[in-house]
Amino acid sequence: MDRSRVLEQLIPELTRLLSLLDHEYLSDSTLEKKMAVASLLQSLQPLPAKEVSFLYVNTADLHSGPSFVESLFEEFDCDLGDLRDMSDDGERSKEASPEPIKSPSLRSTADVPPPLPNKPPPEDYYEEALPLGPGKSPEYISSHNGCSPAQSIVDGYYEDADSSYPTTRMNGESKSSYNDSDAMSSSYESYDEEEEEEKGRQPKHQWPSEEASMHLVRDCRICAFLLRKKRFGQWAKQLTVIKEEQLLCYKSSKDRQPHLRLPLDVCTVVYVPKDSRHKRHELRFSQGATEVLVLALQSREQAEEWLKVIREVSRPIGGAESLEVPRSPVILCKLDQDKRLSQEKQNSDSDSLGMNDSSSTLSRREACEHGKGKKNSLAELKDSMSRAAGRKITRIISFSKKKALSEDLQTFSSEDEAPCCGYLNVLVNHGWKERWCRLRCNTLYFHKDRTDLHTHVNAIALRGCEVAPGFGPRHPFAFRILRNRQEVAILEASCSEDMGRWLGLLLVEMGSKVTPEALHYDYVDVETLTSIVSAGRNSFLYAQSCQDQWPEPRIYDEVPYEKVQDEEPQRPTGAQVKRHASSCSEKSHRADPQVKVKRHASSANQYKYGKNRAEEDARRYLVEKERLEKEKETIRTELTALRQEKKELKEAIRNNPGAKLKALEEAVATLDAQCRAKEEQRIDLELKLVAVKERLQQSLAGGPALGLSVSSKSKSQETTNKPQSSVPEQSLPVNCVSEMRKRSPSIVTSNQGRVLQKAKEWEMKKT
């Protein structure tokens, strides 16, 4: 096919290809190539097809021969004398006799150009000639938009002009065609304008890597990598995009979610030009009186371009140009802003300081900028301060200057009361970091500080996990959280009691049936082991008792709820409560820990010791005390009857020493056994009664101060509706206080000794 015809078909095809590429998202290198081809096509289209012979088209296939431009100069040979004989009016001499061409065998290897390629190049292959600068060699940039055969030409290769260009003979003297200014001037004279156009068409925004996410800038109005101002005057380069009436900031072009999302329809934008005070062109975004974002731009033109886009975004859709009213507040001029700030500085509070970089006001920023002494000291502080120290100083200043909100105070108070949170050392990247840990809904949350509970660093779902104490002899109070025998987290407590407390809480939250006593402890001595196990058992029992009621702690014993009766037993009056309270022994300050008291379902609704809780406890203990006293009177009556019968049998044995003596003795032995059993029942009732009286006294001690009032009901309903206290001891769980009391057997011994002594004295009086 004729070469000119191919070029005629190639130009419109390239034009259509470029129009299709205008609607595609291209990388920077591809965009540069496209603009270069477009400029070449624009310069070629007005010319007729026969005048496009100066276009550089490299027909070499896989670098197997010279380019098309080189082949043009291969047979260009003339004598200098023929050039002198040319007339001034432009007539050329027709009798130019070129020097005969040397045979290939006589030519040197360096003078012989490589042969022309036999097969045409691929359709998507082209070569672009860039303009020559002073002291530079011609630069050829080749590109493949599609698939190419093996050993394809790599993008951006360079050809050495001195070695690759063919030689030109003038007057019998061999010269390189590259140095022939007359021959090359016609080919390079028009590239100065194209060079300026290429500089103007270069893309402004450079992506840092090829794998950068291009979908971030899809359908956006404008995008660029801008500097965003952080706290303490630090700057960070972020990808800034305006899309769908929002300004989005990404920390990296690979991010999927924006780091900051700012609606422009509710913001005020102020442009601060670069001057002696401001080292950069800045755009300041504010919401109300709070400055939320500061961006730095490279030039005034770039700032005006961004302001133009922001005005277009804030402009109402479909409004007339003369009647347009922006939805966002008007973009203020810097001079007007300075006047307004000078008035606001007098009323600004000097103690106000935000918790983060988006909470400082415009007036505070301008006031700080005017204070040169503060600015210099802050600049020195920035140079010597690390990021961690900066965050700590911010928290300290904010804590001392800013008033805490009421809900934050309530959160802190509840966190202090509950044992399900505290500081732990966490192993992160082979280093220990202190974190505020919190248990909630079977999940362990890690916070940077106890004041920052709204965001957490990490969270671990505890269901299905295991806990294993020990992490080497250097960390005796460390323990590990395992899931499927894989370490999920390594934590370290500050002391043995803290370690035991966390172990008990974690075991309950994990739903494990293992108790703290069953765990295997290494690297601790016997004393420390006892402390860990004791604290672990206490927290384990506590967490079991109030597993579903975080974070309110319980005070009294936790027992299973009884069935709520349809008819509540009558409660005694307030006068009866006072009478019974005064009759309680003041010497009994300690109760038997083995005595368990049933908790009615109605009293389980209150979790803190308030007015309702005191009233419910007083009623329950009073009813229990009266029931025990009634049962005690019944046993005492039965015991008196048995002793009377025993006394009569002994008198009968004394009076009748005959044949019935053996039967009478057996009857007396049977009565003795019955009396001993009744006496044991009476002693148990005495112990229970002492414990109930003590707890009644404790509830009444807190009740009157809270306005306690106890209603009364009849004793007949009390006897019919109140169940018997025949619940076995094993079915009633107790809290950690009762378990601690179990460790002092002297309490039980002293109570039993007094009761037995009183019972013996009472028996001696009766007999």
UniProtKB/Swiss-Prot annotation:
SMART domains: PH
Composition skew (Low complexity), residue ranges: 174-189
Residue numbers bearing the Phosphoserine modification: S87, S93, S97, S103, S152, S328, S342, S746
Transmembrane annotation, as ranges: none
Composition-biased stretches (Polar residues): 164-173, 349-362, 709-733
UniProt feature coiled coil, ranges: 610-700
Localisation: Cytoplasm; Cell projection, Podosome; Cell projection, Invadopodium
PH domain mapped to chain residues: 219-315, 417-511
Disordered: annotated segments: 83-145, 164-210, 341-381, 563-605, 704-767
Record InterPro entries: AFAP, PH-like_dom_sf, PH_domain
Compositionally biased spans, kind Basic and acidic residues: 83-97, 586-595, 758-767
One Gene Ontology cellular component annotation held by this UniProt entry: podosome
Keyword field: Cell junction, Cell projection, Coiled coil, Cytoplasm, Phosphoprotein, Repeat
Modification type Phosphotyrosine: residues: Y556
Protein's job: May be involved in podosome and invadosome formation.
Record's protein name: Actin filament-associated protein 1-like 1
Organism: Rattus norvegicus (Rat)
